[in-house]
Design a protein with these regions (language model features):
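Structured beta-strand/turn binding interfaces of compact recognition modules in eukaryotic regulators
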Residues: 156, 191, 204-206
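C-terminal edge-of-domain segments
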Residues: 197-207
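Conserved short secondary-structure elements within globular domains
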Residues: 161, 169-191
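N-terminal accessory segment detector
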Residues: 2-170, 208-245
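Generic structural hydrophobic/aromatic packing signal, biased to beta-strands
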Residues: 126, 151-153, 176, 190, ...
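A short beta-turn/loop motif at secondary-structure boundaries
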Residues: 191-197
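Core residues of folded domains in eukaryotic genome-function proteins
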Residues: 147-149, 184, 197-199
Length: 245
């Protein structure tokens, strides 16, 4: 009598495939399945932005979100107005008491280390729909210590799609830095790279003064649609700095 082959179902321990890190596997599955939660986050964020701007794009999905962000920047009388509007949008995404309690109870623990590390992890988990693939990394603090409170964005989808330094700076970088510090008690500096569209978040570190921030002196991107329109009306453009940065 021949022995019957025993067919063993795959165990939980053997999944995901050994060749793929668990975090990378889960991320690939989320995107492969259409990203239900990504769609929820996108729709919520766009809804809040539309309420602030008072206008919506006819385009669906992410393309429409970028058009609303562009409208927010172009219709604001000053860059400060754009930043303040973007901060209000970020605040509207959270229950007010949550922000207050986080700033009061979590932010002071261990000199801000716990809060910075927590926010970095939450950002990496929940914001890929907006920025694209990102990972938590270590950042060096001014006192010489290191915290795992950084988030490295490989290629920011928001910057790549908007193609605009001004949108990056005024609707993302500056308002996010201000929101984190003022409403969550966590200092943050964001360092976008306009050459490869990567971005480094450093939670727990104060941003430089405006006059020392090289990001605010960036020229317009060659592919910026707003810069292209300006060139159609005038040749006297300061190409050394984006007028909206």
């Amino acid at each position: 009598m021949k022995a019957l082959a025993v067919i063993r179902p795959p165990s939980i321990c053997s999944w995901p495939p050994q060749s793929l890190p668990k975090s990378q596997y889960l991320r690939s599955q989320r995107f492969r399945k259409g990203g239900v939660m990504d769609e929820v986050f996108l729709n919520l964020f766009r809804k809040k932005m539309v309420e602030e701007v008072g206008w919506d794009s006819g385009k669906p999905g992410y393309d429409g979100l970028i058009e609303v962000a562009n409208r927010l920047m172009l219709e604001s009388p000053t860059n400060s107005h754009t930043k303040e509007a973007a901060v209000r949008i970020l605040r509207s995404l959270f229950p007010p008491m949550l922000l207050q309690l986080y700033k009061l109870l979590i932010a002071p623990i261990q000199g801000g280390k716990v809060a910075a590390i927590m926010v970095a992890r939450v950002t990496a988990i929940t914001c890929e729909w907006l920025m694209g693939p990102c990972t938590v990394n270590s950042v060096d603090l001014p006192d010489g210590t290191s915290w795992n409170s950084g988030v490295f964005v490989e290629k920011c989808k928001y910057l790549e799609q908007s193609k605009c330094v001004g949108i990056c700076v005024n609707t993302c970088k500056l308002p996010t830095q201000a929101f984190m510090k003022d409403y969550m008690g966590v200092p943050l500096v964001m360092e976008p790279n306009f050459s490869d569209y990567s971005c480094q978040f450093k939670f727990g570190i104060l941003p430089p003064l405006p006059e020392d921030d090289a990001t605010l002196k960036e020229p317009c991107l060659d592919i910026c649609p707003n810069a292209t329109r300006r060139r159609e009306f005038t040749r006297n453009i300061n190409v050394q700095q984006c007028p909206k940065a």
